[in-house]
A protein has these predicted regions:
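Core catalytic alpha/beta fold that binds nucleotide/phospho-ligands
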Residues: 1-120
Length: 120
């Protein structure tokens, strides 16, 4: 079965800038990350997850979505997977998106994410 790419989102996050923002505004962690994501201690991993949320918003073309409506979870293999809930899931449904692809990376003080949304 052929699928159609609905959108591609790419984002880059400066790790030090995110670290400073989280230190300056402790409540920001709760606004940006789900309870499971808040357990992560490596700032590079948090930055990559924030990049994924931004990239997901770009795919959906829906500004103002709650950050916690897009979550990065790890499969048993360690591979990251994007899970959308709430208004992000509603926006994805409206676009017909049924499959997400996610790639995360961090090096040299930056974190990147690429998100692809597909429909049948």
């Amino acid at each position: 079965m052929q699928t159609v790419i609905v959108g591609v989102g790419v984002d880059v996050v400066d790790v030090a800038r995110l670290a400073a923002a989280l230190e300056r505004t402790p409540s920001l962690r709760q606004r940006l990350y789900t309870a499971a994501e808040q357990e992560i201690t490596r700032i590079e991993s948090l930055a990559a997850r924030f990049a994924a949320k931004e990239a997901c918003a770009k795919v959906l073309g829906a500004p103002g979505l709650p950050w916690t409506d897009a979550e990065v979870v790890n499969e048993d293999s360690g591979r990251p997977r994007l899970v959308v809930t709430g208004s992000a899931a509603q926006a994805a449904d409206a676009l017909g998106i049924t499959t997400w692809h996610l790639s995360l990376s961090h090096d040299g003080g930056v974190a990147t994410a690429v998100v692809i949304g597909e429909k049948p």
